Amino acid sequence: MKQYLEALEYILENGKDRDDRTGVGTRGVFGYQMRFDLRKEFPAVTTKKLAWKSVVSELLWFLEGSSDERRLAEIHYGKPREELVGKNTIWTANADKQAKDLGYVNTDTIKDLGPVYGHQWRTWDAALGFVDQIAEVLENMHYDPNSRRHIVSAWNADRVNVMALPPCHTMFQFHIQDGELSCQLYQRSADMFLGVPFNIASYSLLTHMFAQLLDLKVGDFVWTGGDCHIYQNHFEQVKQQIIRTPVAGPTLEMPAFKDLDELVKTTPNDYKLIGYNPMDSIKAPMAV
């Protein structure tokens, strides 16, 4: 993850300061790219601790197609929602603020976020029903591996204004070459300290999952960012992180699954990072 530390340092030194939606203020650059070789190791940040269980929980929640924050809590904690009152997830703040302001149901057991990622991935609204983009991209990669159309988008312009949070990681594309599956993500808005290590791990895991479904090996994960920023109240944490020296990354251990239905029935505890030895966590507030 040396390239990630280099990105932080570059933005801190060369970025421009500007106001933002949250009122916190950022320093950022427009346009940045990083490439990770998934053949060698899993790109989990080692210069601070990655919230791995949260990464897996959210991805399984997306793949299930849910937009209920309390369903994410069930996946993460492995308990029914009735037992999880007061137990938060990484989406609770958005549910209790933006989604509530939009008029969505917000109770102890249901917290609707509107048509966010999972909805767009699995039930994109179409003229004659809906499109299951995940099922379609898997089918298309199986039958037409050389296609340049292996794309999933979460950016639905007609629905953005009714989402609790418009998608930050907006679209991703797969590429198959020589029996290897690679993935490129475009992230329109990139919280470089808190969000990006999480997103890198999430889409790298997705690439491993889909490679297993398609009986392929993994290739590269390419991360491309649009507005790449560091929040002003993260400056000291970033300075602390970039002086740390990264160590070797882990390898990924996944459960067996042969189709999408079996995949979405797996649990966060089924996915393990072997040989993951991160340094201490660096706490920072999330801008909402």
PLM region spans:
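Terminal, non-catalytic protein-protein interaction segments that mediate quaternary/complex assembly
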Residues: 1-288
